[in-house]
Regions:
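Bacterial N-terminal signal peptides
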Residues: 6-16
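N-terminal post-signal-peptidase region of extra-cytosolic proteins
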Residues: 65-70, 79-80, 189-201, 225-230, ...
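Short, solvent-exposed interaction modules
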Residues: 117-163
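Cell wall/extracellular polymer interaction/catalysis modules
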Residues: 145-237
Length: 336
């Protein structure tokens, strides 16, 4: 009798439970119909990425007027980068400030990020797109460990987010058939309604939670990418701003004599919008999608160049009342 009851239980209930498990997520046919985001990538241009040679300063920042000459700048250790001028002598390199540094004080050539954002189609995407923020293999079910049988996905892979399930207070997104990732492993560019107070046709939104930027023409999002905004101790301020000053290349330096001293030569495609906080290109890291700056909005050189040129016609310099592009900084969520 016990054997019969157990057999009936297995026949009646186990298939039902299995079917419920199989129903987690959307129909595989839908995933097959929309396998990846319908966006156009912005490809990097080698002649723009590699037109300069950047080096990190390993030792205290000391610059000389000539090889074996006198010290004309001595600012100590920090997060310091210089650009080589292409002129060298044994054990010495000239930098763009027309000064010289010892070769032993400089690192090897900096590796430039090749990351680029995407252009949105005219019609809204059927599913929210996202970028993966680390190398990973997706889990087979929400909340599970990575499945070694799932294909390896590189950081910055573009994926569709088909649906989500909450596990222990956090979202897990379905990115394929039996493929799920934790919300912290992806960044989503989330279009927002045009805020009141935006005073330019072209404008950008900066989402500090998702670490993304979206460029708009009117109410339509046209371009999106990943950023790195200010760390908690040097936050990027929320609010509505306008770019007030722009430069194709500029020196950025601050906190001299303090532990967070930095000196960055030739920061590319720079647009200041909040005091000394700017949107700008970044040659010294490839960690987009995470906060890591001194307050500025770091972008790849590819993305910052596009944004700079796309917005260059916003301000009419023949009209004294004209302003440069509006920048809306907000947060779509709260950091834990």
């Amino acid at each position: 009798m016990r054997t019969l009851i157990l057999t009936l239980f297995v026949l009646l209930f186990v298939p039902s439970l299995f079917a419920q498990e199989q129903r987690v997520g959307i129909d595989p046919a839908i995933i097959e119909a929309y396998p990846e985001p319908n966006v156009e990538p912005l490809y990097p241009q080698d002649n723009m990425l590699y037109d300069r040679v950047y080096r990190r300063v390993n030792n205290p920042l000391q610059m000389f007027d000539n090889p074996n000459g006198s010290i004309v700048q001595d600012m100590g250790k920090g997060f310091n980068f210089v650009t080589l001028a292409g002129v060298s002598q044994p054990e010495w390199e000239q930098v763009t400030t027309d000064r010289w540094m010892r070769t032993t004080d400089l690192s090897e050539e900096v590796t430039i990020s090749r990351f680029g954002g995407v252009f949105f189609p005219e019609n809204p995407l059927p599913y929210q797109m996202a970028w993966t923020l680390r190398h990973l293999r997706a889990s087979s079910t929400p909340g599970a460990d990575e499945n070694p049988d799932n294909e390896f996905m590189y950081r910055y892979t573009r994926v569709n987010l088909y649906t989500s399930v909450e596990v222990d207070g956090k979202l897990w997104y379905q990115i394929g058939v039996n493929k799920w990732v934790h919300q912290f492993d992806v960044a989503r560019p989330l279009p927002v309604e045009r805020p009141e107070g935006i005073n330019t046709e072209k404008w950008v939104s900066v989402d500090l939670y998702e670490q993304s930027v979206i460029a708009y023409e009117g109410t339509r999002p046209v371009f999106a990418t990943l950023i790195s905004s200010g760390l908690a101790e040097w936050p990027t301020n929320e609010g509505l701003f306008n770019v007030y000053f722009r430069r194709e290349r500029t020196l950025m330096s601050g906190a001299e004599g303090l532990p967070d001293f930095y000196y960055l030569e030739e920061v590319p495609w720079t647009m200041f919008f909040d005091d000394d906080i700017a949107l700008h290109g970044t040659y010294w890291h490839d960690g987009f999608g995470y906060r890591r700056s001194h307050g500025c909005v770091n972008m790849s050189i590819t993305d910052s160049n596009w944004l700079y040129r796309w917005s260059s016609d916003v301000r009419d310099f023949n009209n004294p009342d004209s302003v440069d592009i509006a920048v809306y900084v907000y947060s779509s969520g709260t950091y834990d």
